Amino acid sequence: MAQYDIRKQYLDFFASKSHKVYDSMPLVPDDASLLFTNAGMVQFKDIFTGKIPIPAPPRATSSQLCIRAGGKHNDLENVGYTARHHTLFEMLGNFSFGDYFKKEAIAYAWEFVTQVLGFSKDVLYVTIHESDDEAYELWCEHIEPSRIKRMGDKDNFWQMGDSGPCGPCSEIYVDQGEKYFQSDEDYFGGEGDRFLEIWNLVFMQFEQKGGVRTLLPKPSIDTGMGLERVIALKEGKINNFDTSLFAPLMQCLQKLTNKTYFGDDEIFDRLDLQEAEMIKIKNIQASFRVIADHARSVAFLLAQGVNFDKEGRGYVLRRILRRAVRHGYLLGLKKPFLWQVVEVVCESMGVHYSYLQERKRAIKEQCKNEEERFFETIESGMTLFSTELEKLQSAVQTQKQEILFSGEVAFKLYDTYGFPLDLTQDMLRERHIQVDMQAFEQCMNEQKSRSKASWKGSGDALKEGDFNALLSKFGENKFVGYESNKETCKIKALLDSQFKMVDTLSPSSQGWVMLDKTPFYPESGGPVGDKGALYSTNRILQSAQAQKFAQVLDTQKFFGLNLSQIEALSALKVGQEVFAEVDSIRFEIAKHHSATHLLHLALRTILGSHIAQAGSLVQPHRLRFDFSHPKALTNEEITHIENLVNEQILQSNAQLCENMDMQQAKAKGAMALFGEKYGERVRVVSFGDSIELCGGIHVNNTAEIGSFYIVKESGVSSGVRRIEAVCGNAAYHYGKNALLELSRARESLKAQDVLQGIEKIKMQLNEAKEKANKAKQSVKSLDYEEINGVRLIVLKLDSVSANEAKEIIDRSKNENESVAILLLSESNNKISIVAGVKNAPLKAGAWVKQVAQELGGNGGGRDDFATAGGKDIDKISQALNLAKDIATKALQ
């Protein structure tokens, strides 16, 4: 099978390049920060970060099993509905630890892709970081410069975190062709799926610390390539689930359900399908894919010792299984079945992962037992779900506003019938309905024993008992940073990086400090935690001799305690007096935080009172605000919202901060935010008409915010929109960059008025489209000759794209009983050839191939339709004559 061949080819190739082959590490990593192993570099993380010595040889390669179904990397909800998402996948990777770098990494990748995998360089493209001239020059030794695209940090810069190794990356793409990909975004660099990324080469050449990047003395290489994607490309499939890798699972499901599974390419060719039939096939297809994917995760997690549980990794496993069972239920499977699919996983993948075969019996039994537990309640749960849904649909018909699925019912499904929340949300997503999360969370909070999902956290060994011991010993440490960002404090407690109490912290070590009172505000409700420094107490006198004891990296609140994460610059000890000073970036955070309040008010004013905050992030350089709203905002709405926020800023409203009872706050009209916990006494922050419960840091007057720009509006999920915006210094730089881009646009368009320049280009495009339309409409008038009852058409058409030529061919085939047609067009020094044959003794694939070779190109396709390309423009006349000669001989 392809999976074994490609995996072996990859590992053998890099072994021949002096790499040591490493086995796939366990899916449960020895890394407190991770829920599951989610990338090939995880087992080498300590080498990259310098925690352990570089091994010999300093080169490694592996095929790593990865899980992405919880925590930061969670693809669970996308599985089954996209071509590439999986909860479990294999990542092929090669790594260099201070040994070879870009030149060899690029050369190895090119050699493997072209010589081992056999991809033609004509279908390969590459992206690099916009600043990486070295990578550009190296790639130019292998590929045409026109196939190299520079991208920004978002796409082509990798970093492990806020600190540590980082660097630019380069990605290799494969052009899957235009047959199945014909959207406006299907161009290299577009959002379409035609150009598929298969390999990411990360060049770790920097060390990032405190926002500063310095060159590493020994740069390293980290690469990753998805095995499932490579198999799909090699087998000519446009969806990973349609490959030989998943074929045994699809065959098993077809037998179990007595339903047929169609691949994406099969559906594409079924032009006779009605919409209702297509929807039915797509739903079956999605359920098959969910089950097949989840069966793999269940098999491997059980095999590696993860058990079904109410929390942690075991709960993620339970969620995966129950989501698969629910999709089986949709297919008519009303008794345990997944264990049979899991058995096929063990058999098909056990050839390479022998422990699947060895533990197959236990895996099947565990899976079947868990299924039986869920099937005991699924019928009752589905009845409850359907009953609530009927009520909801009746309400929708009588009320125009958005109706939410009862949070109480969702909780009952979870608590009584074992339906994980995301399973209920998954069932509702198909109907474009959301759960009332506020009501659900209220029920969850009342059920304390079920309120903790440990997989949500970072994985650090935070135990409530440890912090309660600190709390009972010292009490809460008071936050004093509202009035000042500086304070003389005493160190009450020190904790090392593993949260163990210590008496001292040595220089260069990281840990956590608890001050008796603190000016550092913890991360809460959106704003990131304060940073800063700890100095000797003579800092208060602005003494030049003041010593800097520690850098404050972050501030968090754990079980009522304000703790600051620090990096000690000199020895620190419990009881020591220090002068704590907050970094000046707090003012930029405060600007964005206050702007978030004004944005919330503007959204409710412009869009309506249904707007509710669904999440936020406030940083020194930007803000992100998620809110409930059923549809995308129009440009006009965005402009109104932005203008209203700026109007509030210009009103120079002073901050009014009051502490009062919750009932008083509600009577005042203060907005309480979803997900926040409030006591009996609350802090109310007001700026004019904006009144919210908030404990955070704000500007004293809205005028301090400066200006406000909305950078982006997008969808997060069904019924939730997101606005990203900037203000203060970030807004100044945003505006400056916008003016620079406008200037560049003028230069590019060669027009002082950008809009006029764009209109001119649009007119030119419309003229070209008109020419193309005329060509499409003149099918019946195309020059032709009749040979033995077959209409033969061989023509060169101007201003016609390959897609438009295909439309002409399709129309000719529809309008003629027997036809052989070949159209040739030339654009940008490239020649496109498209051919179609209907009821004629001529094969389109062979026809275009011979013509393309005459033009210095290549191509092919089916007997009834084929495409090709060429580059020798001066041979177009000879190529047309050749096309006629080939067809004439075949038809006589």
UniProtKB/Swiss-Prot annotation:
GO MF annotations in UniProt: alanine-tRNA ligase activity; aminoacyl-tRNA deacylase activity; ATP binding; tRNA binding; zinc ion binding
Tree of life domain: Bacteria
Location in the cell: Cytoplasm
Keywords: Aminoacyl-tRNA synthetase, ATP-binding, Cytoplasm, Ligase, Metal-binding, Nucleotide-binding, Protein biosynthesis, RNA-binding, tRNA-binding, Zinc
Enzyme class: ligase
Binding-site residues, Zn(2+): 593, 597, 694, 698
Stored InterPro entries: aa-tRNA-synth_II/BPL/LPL (IPR045864), Ala-tRNA-lgiase_IIc (IPR002318), Ala-tRNA-ligase_IIc_anticod-bd (IPR018162), Ala-tRNA-synth_IIc_core (IPR018165), Ala-tRNA-synth_IIc_N (IPR018164), Ala-tRNA_ligase (IPR050058), Ala_tRNA_ligase_euk/bac (IPR023033), DHHA1_dom (IPR003156)
Principal place of residence: cytoplasm
Cofactor note: Binds 1 zinc ion per subunit.
SMART domains documented for this protein: tRNA_SAD
Cofactor: Zn(2+)
A GO BP annotation: negative regulation of DNA-templated transcription
The EC number(s) this enzyme carries: 6.1.1.7
Catalytic activity of the protein: tRNA(Ala) + L-alanine + ATP = L-alanyl-tRNA(Ala) + AMP + diphosphate
Pfam families: DHHA1 (PF02272), tRNA-synt_2c (PF01411), tRNA_SAD (PF07973)
Any one of the GO CC terms: cytosol
Protein's job: Catalyzes the attachment of alanine to tRNA(Ala) in a two-step reaction: alanine is first activated by ATP to form Ala-AMP and then transferred to the acceptor end of tRNA(Ala). Also edits incorrectly charged Ser-tRNA(Ala) and Gly-tRNA(Ala) via its editing domain.
Domains: entry comment: Consists of three domains; the N-terminal catalytic domain, the editing domain and the C-terminal C-Ala domain. The editing domain removes incorrectly charged amino acids, while the C-Ala domain, along with tRNA(Ala), serves as a bridge to cooperatively bring together the editing and aminoacylation centers thus stimulating deacylation of misacylated tRNAs.
HAMAP family referenced in this protein's UniProt entry, alphabetically: Ala_tRNA_synth_B
Family assignment from sequence similarity: Belongs to the class-II aminoacyl-tRNA synthetase family.
Protein name per Swiss-Prot or TrEMBL: Alanine--tRNA ligase
Organism: Helicobacter hepaticus (strain ATCC 51449 / 3B1)
Lineage, broadest ranks: Bacteria, Pseudomonadati, Campylobacterota, Epsilonproteobacteria, Campylobacterales
